[in-house]
Amino acid sequence: MSISLKALKKSPWVFHVNTGACNNCDIEILDCLTPRFDVERFGVVLVGSVRHADVLLISGPLTQNCLPRLRRVYDAAPKPIKVVAFGACGCKCGIFRDAYNTVGPIDKFIPVDAYIPGCPPKPETIISGIVKVLNSL
């Protein structure tokens, strides 16, 4: 295992992308950062720039307006990057599957390494999913 992959397992930096969600999943991400759940005990840090990220955490159904933005974000991310789709909408478009402006699930456009289902997923589930992705390295 290379040195960079070992470092990634110990302190992953996560960048969140919302592709048209209702905001419930975003609130659960914030819950992960509170002292009750303390995702930082695993070395996970939420970053403000995709250029610093090791993991992309994507929520929401992919809309026509967000598709070009998601592609730009994915292309700007340093490789290798792990992609996690979370929430019912992030995994398979949820209740917005047949909406006029939904183009399809995220894995139709970029490769996804893990799925965290739920509407919204609980903070424990989000943390467990991220840790499992990192343990798969």
Predicted regions and their residues:
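Iron-sulfur-associated redox domains of electron-transfer enzymes in respiratory
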Residues: 1-137
